[in-house]
Amino acid sequence: MSQEDVIMPKISIVMPVYNASKYLEEALCSVLGQTFTDYELICINDCSTDGSLETLRTYQETDSRISILNNPEHRGAAYSRNRGMKVARGEYLAFLDGDDIFDEAMFMKAYRTAKEKLADIVTYQYLHVSSENIHNKINRDYSEGYMNRYCRQPFSLSEYEPAELLQFPLGPWNKLYRRSLIEDNHLTFQDLPSGNDLYFVFMALLLSKKTVMVEDSHVMVYVRDHFSSGRISLNRDPMCTYRAFMKVGQEMAALSMFDKLYAHFYYRVFYSLRDALLADGNRERAKQFYGFLQQEGIDHVRSIDSGCYDRLDEYIKNGFQCFIENDFESGWYREENILKLFLYQNVNKVTALFEKYESHGKKIAIWGAGENGRVLLEFCRRHNMHVSAVVDRSKDKQGTELCGFKVASLQEISDDIQVIIISACFIYEDVVRAVGDKNIEVIDINRFLCIA
């Protein structure tokens, strides 16, 4: 065994830093406070002007695991992460941001899972939260079906159904990557103002032979849900998403992966374009991007391999066609989410669920007056599934109208309802507690469909 092998850390943590002084110390403390200690922390200072470099140097003086690279000029997150990867020595790579915080057992649980399962990629829970709620510890309990599918044995997403890839976020910060997987496939972050991680993460997930999720349902990464000065990618231009996936498609074709995985690609592209439109805070720019998709963008996506595109299922092909046939102002894309896809892929299963309760004279309420609630109600209406009420615990939503229903509180409907079907993810335990000893059965539609 060489000296290099002996001193090689198990994990290399790459952290780009740009004007993150408001939260940087907190982020560093949550890394240095990890129960797992065999790592190096590579901080890339991207010409910060707010004292971030001084904070990094202060911590470096007290902990030899910290190294600092200074960019000669402001280059952005992609350049910084790529530079950090070049000097990384760890068996696994992790990418963190300088304004987030991390559960103290994150790396211990992730690395243990990686070694036990011989994984190329380990994923774990994350949550977008506001700064004032970032210290609230949260669990997101998995269903048994979800655990069996994603946590207990490693898998290759290329062997799973295309829609399942949608459940894996394309942010880099909730994953451990085997460094050899990244280096052997020459994966780097794309030089884009935003969305520079999409190509890197998507290709890594497709190329990984063994991916697994940490079985523990504690949230591991708390991502600040804001456009803070600590984030390098502030400008969510939807065109960056388009460019990222065009590169993915071209790379898949070059690696002879497209014929086998074309559906995985097109599913992800459709929903990512939809998400990009919704994420752009500049309405005029979003409208211009939509016009680009109508005029030429969708045709370019189709033409990566028109033969493969023709073999797609009708649901996704119709989705792409909607970009061309509907105008931006119609807002049709707002309701094209993952729940809707899984509902339509499991019509018979969902129909049987409703028929079971209706045959026993049980009345059903939908819990959740948000996007998922609207999607579920529209699905029920189209398939003649009877819903008696809509309930939400938000006082702002109670009394408003959703799909012809007046949104009620639990207290208002609890005497008349025997079944509640939850539309939103990860609130099952909260709803069960709210129902208490009332004689109401609670079903989580996302768990039922193995989305959560």
Where are these regions (language model features)?
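Hydrophobic, well-ordered beta-alpha structural blocks that scaffold small-molecule cofactor pockets
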Residues: 334-452
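Short, well-formed alpha-helical segments that are part of the catalytic scaffolds
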Residues: 19-33
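Short aromatic/hydrophobic "clamp" motif used to bind/position activated sugar donors
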Residues: 93
